[in-house]
Every structure is written in structure tokens, then in C-alpha cells.
């Protein structure tokens, strides 16, 4: 799919048709070339491909106002098991539902997506405030849990948490769909403890805010979105995910920080819900993580050494942190985000055997009650299970 990179933007209809091999950065750049008041409800990593990102849900900085990428997909093209190219009308609503959050690779080969563009102001405001535990960071995180899901829908404040100089550093990273003065007024009412000032903030076009969240310096040209990847080719990466439905107590946070400091190399990102994410029913798409979730957690670890020992060492560090978080996250099942592929939560046997019972172990975590409908769609469109992988959706006969 790497060569399928065409992007067609129709500002009159406020839509974009993007082929599955195009990256998010390429899509953001193309939209910005056509309009300064339209954006895309997608993620913050410019080099991520749109084909898989949209197929698994696709969340980003405007999800509290506009929902996920899949909530804004209005058409798609897919190659089915018979080699036919289908659009929304010819594939039918059940298959169209399944590929928007259920992972397109279980059902066929996604060629392209058509999505609604969302309205953004000509100027947005961003900030990044860093606070250590010694600077009151833990109390701010506790407050953030109450505030962030209930802020004005134009405000998105994520937490990036890492270990620096033997302590926890929490970065409060914000995008606001508006000017700085309005943001300061809203923050003073809702989160004065953060101590935000005008000098902390930057006003810039929406497309440049995507570079800010990708950790490019302020002033970086929009063409940087077209770069293939900022990750060193020789690096290795493992990720996991969680959903939090109840505020973690101050005492609970202390236990999290203790283990986190011991790990040294893990990064956590906490992404707030609320707003539009609480409006959309869990069954609207296969992505079920909606009402009831305060925020989502992504755990990340990166290393640069080759070999099995390095893999096992870093996997064990991440798994240990994940275990410590068990009391604080969703249960029965412990939910996970499809796009953060994680074989630890279940996978089909290595001998190629696939069945519904085995798939339900991971499927319920990714899709909750939507798993059974995904199996029904799979049974209808791919009964012989031609499209399969370690965590795919199986048909009923298997």
C-alpha cells in the first residue's frame, strides 16, 4: 500500500479522499494547502499511515469536539476476498461499520477513505507546561483527572509522563481551538491550579499545532509533515494501553510514581475523554471506548540494543508497570486500544489455528460487546478466513 498515497481535498464539500498508503502528515499538509479553517480528526504522529490509523479508530487532539477519525468517515474502498473493489454502497452498511474501528485487515484490503473535514479557527493556541513531583505535579495530576474530561470541548490537555533526574516529570500539553485570551479565561475558571500564563502559550495555524504535538520546535515549517519518520531506524518499540473509569486517588498516584521511577525508561501518555466522546454510543462503530471512560493511557518503551535479551528486559519492564496499574483501570475485561497492537492480551496460536473462543480473549478487550457483531460480519464476507493475522476477527465456523 506504500504507493497508494493520493489525496484529494474538496473544500466545497468539506471532504478529503485519502488513499491508504498516505501518512497523517501528508493528509494534514494537503488539507492545510487548501484551507486554513479545516482540519482532520486524527492522531499526532505524522508518519503513521492513514489506512491502519483510521481502521482502528484514530484519536487525536480534536476528539473531545469531533470524535475519532472513524466517526467522520463517510465512505471507503476495499478489495474483498473475491477481488472486487467495493465502496460503501456496494459493500453494505454492516461491512462499512466493521472496517471503521474493527480493523480493516480482518475483512479485506483498504484502498482509500473518504472523510468529513472538521472546522477549525484560523488560529489555535497550544502550550506545554512541565511540572515535577517536587513542583506539585502529583496534586496537579489528581486535579487533572477531575477537570480534563469536563473542560470546554475546544480544550484538549493530555499528560505526557516520564522520569527525569530520578523524579517524575509531568507535561501538560494542550491544544485549544481558539485564541489565547479565551483559553486563559476558561482555564482560570476550571483549572487555576495549573498557573497558566499568556507567556506559556503560542498562537499558530492548526496545521502547525500538529507539528507542536509531534514535538517539533515552534516555527518549524509545515513541510516537515511530509518527512517519512522521525524515529531512528535502529530503535525498537513496545506499547500497551489502558482505560481509566474512576479517578486514581492521591495515594494510588503515589504508588504509580514509585514504580514509574523504578522503571526509568517508560513514557506514559494520558489522553482525556469527555465531550463528543461521551455523546457517541459504544455500538456506533466497533470502537467501544466511549461513555464511562475518563481517559486513556498509552505506555511506551523504546530501546536501541539488538538481541533477545534486550527484548525480554524491556518487555518485562513494561509488563511490570502494566501490572501495577491493574487496580486503577477498567475491568472485566481490561480494555485495550486496537491500534496499539499488544500480543500480551491474547493472540491466535502460532500454529495458525484460529477460533472464536481464542479470539474473544483479545477481541472483548478491543471491542467489548461489538466483538460478536464483528464475527457476524466476518462470517458473511470472508467465511473461509482468508484475511487473518495474530489478532484478527474469525468467522463463526472456526
What are these regions (language model features)?
Residues 1-398:
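Soluble FAD-dependent oxygen oxidases
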